[in-house]
């Protein structure tokens, strides 16, 4: 058993690919969660201000004076967008987990069959 059969090598490669995708997805999800928390915090703080209070919003490296209500509306839209993105990432994460479990079961089955053949074949294809 010096070398794994191509089918098992392929399954291992697929599992590694799914693991890499899951890791990238987790990083994206963490970033979106952080942005959502920041946006929620800004929204909550802005709600505490009086109507008509001077408000500034960032535009690149600039701070621009804006209407409080407009900024609240913008923050609400951002929150909604981040929520949608987070739900989408969670669904992708579930699909990847399902795919990983499926590949893992296939690999276990293939390895079990390979071990079941034992050394009787001498590792040669006939």
Swiss-Prot record:
One of its GO terms (biological process) is protein folding. One of its GO terms (molecular function) is unfolded protein binding. Keywords: Chaperone, Cytoplasm. The keyword Coiled coil does not apply. It is found in: Cytoplasm. Heterohexamer of two alpha and four beta subunits. Belongs to the prefoldin subunit beta family. This is Prefoldin subunit beta.
